[in-house]
Swiss-Prot record:
An annotated Gene Ontology molecular function: magnesium ion binding
Known EC number: 2.4.2.9
Its job: Catalyzes the conversion of uracil and 5-phospho-alpha-D-ribose 1-diphosphate (PRPP) to UMP and diphosphate.
Keywords: Allosteric enzyme, Glycosyltransferase, GTP-binding, Magnesium, Nucleotide-binding, Transferase
Name under which the protein is recorded: Uracil phosphoribosyltransferase
Family the UniProt entry places it in: Belongs to the UPRTase family.
CDD domains xrefs: PRTases_typeI
PANTHER family: ADENINE PHOSPHORIBOSYLTRANSFERASE, URACIL PHOSPHORIBOSYLTRANSFERASE, CHLOROPLASTIC
Organism: Shewanella loihica (strain ATCC BAA-1088 / PV-4)
Catalytic activity: UMP + diphosphate = 5-phospho-alpha-D-ribose 1-diphosphate + uracil
Cofactor(s) annotated in UniProt: Mg(2+)
Residue positions binding uracil: 193, 198-200
Pathway: Pyrimidine metabolism; UMP biosynthesis via salvage pathway; UMP from uracil: step 1/1
HAMAP family: Upp_B
Amino acid sequence: MKVVEVKHPLVRHKIGLMREGDISTKRFRELAAEVGSLLTYEATADFETEKVTIEGWNGPVEVEQIKGKKVTVVPILRAGLGMMDGVLEHVPSARISVVGIYRDEETLEPVPYFEKLASNMHERIALVVDPMLATGGSMISTIDLLKERGCTSIKALVLVAAPEGIAALEKAHPDIELYTASIDKCLNENGYILPGLGDAGDKIFGTK
């Protein structure tokens, strides 16, 4: 599995700001979208382009445009919604596929509860977004579903990843790509990433 920890200074700075314990909901939400945007920039670097001729201000001009497979952005509910707008800045014509999965607080196992995927998944590149890759369960379940629907080109974008989650994801889906702003130290006994960001969903939506 290709794992990319994006070490751009802007990414490191913004993730550092997100770690503040008393960060406001507004600021956390803004930063989640901003880092999501920067991760998308990295994740789409291998997209192929083709030359086309358009009508410019002074006549025909040859330009490059993205070619090949269409894109679908797949936020994992609910926290993944916080990154979605940042991703769409770069791929505004992408279709949105939604997957609802929550983690059982006792077993730490993923529990699916909703799905609505774009059509023709076999023709699409999926950008799966979720702020935290902790145990990896939710991401693995989502990618299982995407593959069942025929999707073969999948990239996962997460703000923070735990080594345990990366190992689990690689074991389950060695053919995908993972882009993260930070590979953190470990999981604690409750399955939270350390140092992590806290509960990203609660911070994005202002709930507890």
